[in-house]
UniProtKB/Swiss-Prot annotation:
NCBIfam families: OAFO_sf, Oxoac_fdxalpha_Archa
Temperature-related properties: Optimum temperature is 70 degrees Celsius.
EC code(s) of this entry: 1.2.7.11
Domain notes: The Tyr-Pro-Ile-Thr-Pro (YPITP) motif is important for the turnover of the reaction, presumably through its flexibility and mobility.
Physiological role: Catalyzes the coenzyme A-dependent oxidative decarboxylation of different 2-oxoacids such as 2-oxoglutarate, pyruvate and 2-oxobutyrate to form their CoA derivatives.
Protein name (database record): 2-oxoacid:ferredoxin oxidoreductase subunit alpha
GO MF term list: 2-oxobutyrate synthase activity; 2-oxoglutarate synthase activity; pyruvate synthase activity
pH-dependence annotation: Optimum pH is between 7-8.
SUPFAM superfamilies, A to Z: Pyruvate-ferredoxin oxidoreductase, PFOR, domain III, Thiamin diphosphate-binding fold (THDP-binding), TK C-terminal domain-like
Coiled coil location: none
InterPro entries linked to this entry: 2-oxoacid/accept_OxRdtase_asu, 2-oxoacid_Fdx_oxidoreductase, PFOR_II, Pyruvate:ferred/Flavod_OxRd, Pyrv/ketoisovalerate_OxRed_cat, Pyrv_Fd/Flavodoxin_OxRdtase_N, Pyrv_flavodox_OxRed_cen, THDP-binding
Alphabetical keyword list: Oxidoreductase, Pyruvate
Gene3D superfamilies: 3.40.50.920, 3.40.50.970, Pyruvate-ferredoxin oxidoreductase, PFOR, domain III
């Protein structure tokens, strides 16, 4: 069972809060949630919406075609009316609003809406859209007089109408919640947990009760057993918690969308407690979080902290990473165990700050002048983002090299309500590598040439060590002799070879579905969920592909990829960029090139129904390159 639900409204009007109230209430009834928020890069006023999937088992994606659309403005209706399958809930106040009158709507969107409606023989008001939905698509339309309800709220709560108006979005979620047929008290509980101030809890509770009185249940979902602890995770929070569990002690950042939320979360949870495994003693510790003056300062601060022996990281997005590249090169030259969590958004330049992309894969793999090792991993869901927060810190300290953790914006700003046990927190392990505290020598060969390329690491203050951006000898002193250059160059690169030998290729790739299928799909990052959900539906239509999700791009799991792709008729690369960059990396490392591509670069996340149709277009129609366009 799956139901897709969407709420939309003006940026800053509480769309995100409303969706979380709704989702938590549904989760209290025993259901699982996956949701994604889309918003413009402005503070207030532009169109924002939240797309959410409800299921009796954990969903992994959203859909373009939705069962329920609930709105409290005209623009949401104009932007999304062709995505509605079952029900539209709307405010009667906007019935006579014309598409041409919505000033916040971009001209090309207005033009498209007007053209579509006129070609279908309708006018351009909300009422015309409603008539189209009822006659052409059989959608059930539920009008609600928001103002009438708000006046009653003001009267019952004894507040001014302007105060009661802040419960407008609660009317929308309450009406759609009642359609599901779930216990009303769960929604009330979710409201009171969200609004701590008594007056706002009161007006929103009254608004919800009045709205639900006007609606008859339509779906009649049964209440499911809810005896397991659940957790509400978005990608930013998952990565942050993973870092905290992984022993992070220093985080630097410069504010940038969509990376800032991770650092803000860590800043709000700076005090941590650890337990000594030998004595059982509980110890209090602190994570230092610094908002730097710019991104170059942020990466250099993190590198400096890492050299003291603590686990250190920074977080940024495309424009910020561009500025960090010089500092990352210094970290590469000095073999600094620093982690960069790279939240990928639309580029180039400022690009699309609040939209998703996977166009920075090649940049992450090759950024910086000269050649130096870096490990690059990519998360595909919230559980992986959690584990990768720790994994990145382990890899950085073990191999003494920068680690880049890729999280695309679609994963960062989506959230899921899942069983807490699926996180496997009890399986977290800390790996530190060759850290030497008592060196018994005043001066350490910090860059000692070893068989595996990894040298003893003494934290600053425990032995005399030297660091410079220049080429250096084993002690760290500047040295330009050709023989030394060759040895130190090879020593650094050898660490990546060591990592390639030691890290099982099976841990660098996830494989799903029918491994004997003639159809193999390769992907990375957030498209994973949409593909897996699409595969479930395709199985009923006789298409049973295999999915290969790449978890680590450097070092690349080339031997396993060759084995998995051997003899496949269809090798379909699915990702959110124009060139199919993962396919390019595959070809570079294995000589195997994808035969087909399903790509998307409009800044919106991949959705299961459009991915499903894309796979069918490849397998059944032989289309070599399918471009997806879903999302407003």
């Amino acid at each position: 069972m799956r139901i897709s639900w969407m709420i939309g409204g003006a940026q800053g009007s509480g769309v995100d809060t409303s969706a979380n109230i709704f989702g938590n209430a549904v989760a209290a009834s025993g259901y699982y949630i996956y949701g994604n928020r889309e918003y413009y890069s402005n503070i207030k006023g532009r169109h924002s919406y939240f797309n959410l999937t409800i299921s009796d088992k954990p969903p992994r994606s959203i859909a373009q075609q939705i069962e329920i659309l609930t709105s409290f403005d005209a623009e949401t209706i104009f932007q999304h009316f062709n995505e509605v399958k079952d029900v539209l809930i709307y405010s009667t106040e906007v019935e006579n609003t014309k598409a041409e009158q919505v000033q916040s709507m971009e001209p090309e969107i207005t033009e498209h809406v007007v053209k579509f409606l006129k070609e279908k023989g309708y006018g351009t008001t909300v009422k015309d859209v409603i008539n189209y939905l009822k006659k052409e698509k059989g959608v059930k339309v539920i009008p609600i007089d928001y103002m009438e309800i708000l006046k009653k709220v003001a009267d019952q709560a004894k507040v001014q109408l302007s105060v009661a108006d802040r419960a407008r979005n609660t009317i929308a979620i309450a009406a759609s919640y009642k359609l599901l047929g779930l216990k009303e008290q769960y929604l009330i509980n979710s409201i009171t947990r969200t609004f701590r101030q008594e007056v706002f809890a009161k007006i929103n509770t009254i608004a919800a009760q009045l709205a639900m009185q006007q609606i008859q249940p339509m779906y009649n979902l049964p209440e499911l057993p809810n005896n397991e602890e659940k957790i509400n995770l978005d990608g930013n929070t998952a990565a942050a918690i993973g870092k905290i569990y992984g022993g992070l002690r220093f985080q630097s950042y410069y504010p940038i969308t969509p990376a800032s939320d991770e650092s803000v979360f860590i800043e709000a949870h700076q005090t941590v407690f650890t337990v000594d495994p030998k004595t059982g003693e509980k110890r209090k510790s602190t994570i230092v979080v610094v908002q730097a003056e710019d991104e170059l300062a942020a990466i250099n601060m993190a590198s400096g902290a890492a050299l003291t022996g603590v686990r250190a990281a920074t977080a940024t997005s495309g424009p910020g990473f561009s500025l960090m590249v010089e500092g990352m090169g210094w970290a590469g030259m000095n073999e600094v165990p620093v982690v960069i969590t790279y939240y990928i958004r639309g580029g180039p330049s400022t690009g699309q700050p609040t939209r998703t992309s996977q166009a920075d894969l090649m940049f992450a793999l090759n950024a910086g002048h000269g050649e130096f090792p870096r490990i690059v991993i990519a998360s595909g869901d919230h559980v992986e983002a959690f584990h990768d927060g720790t994994w990145a810190l382990n890899l950085a300290q073990k191999y003494q090299t920068p680690v880049i953790h890729l999280v695309d914006k679609a994963l960062a700003n989506s959230y899921s309500i899942i069983p807490k046990k699926t996180l496997g927190m009890e399986n977290i392990r800390i790996e530190k590598g060759k850290i030497v505290i008592n060196t018994n020598t005043p001066e350490l060969k910090r860059f000692e040439i070893t068989e595996d390329g990894i040298s003893p690491f003494a934290p600053l203050g425990t032995a005399r060590v030297h660091y410079t951006g220049d080429e250096h000898d084993e002690y760290g002193f500047i040295a330009e002799a050709s023989e030394n250059r060759e040895k130190m160059y090879e020593k650094r690169i050898k660490k990546l070879m060591t990592a390639d030998k030691e890290i099982p290729e099976e841990s660098r790739v996830n494989v799903y579905g029918n491994t004997d299928s003639k159809v193999a799909i390769i992907t990375w990052g957030s498209p994973k969920g949409a593909i897996l959900d699409a595969m479930e539906e395709l199985e009923n239509e006789g298409i049973k592909p295999m999915l290969i999700q790449i978890r680590m791009f450097s070092p690349f799991p080339k031997n396993l990829m060759r084995k998995l792709l051997n003899g496949k008729e269809f090798i379909i690369d699915v990702e959110s960029n124009y060139f199919g960059q993962a396919g390019e990396v595959l070809k570079l490392n294995t000589g195997i090139e994808p035969t087909h591509y399903i790509l998307k670069w409009n800044g919106r996340p991949m959705m299961r129904d459009e991915v499903k149709e894309g796979i069918k277009a490849v397998v059944q129609k032989g289309e070599r390159r399918v471009v997806l366009h879903g999302g407003a």
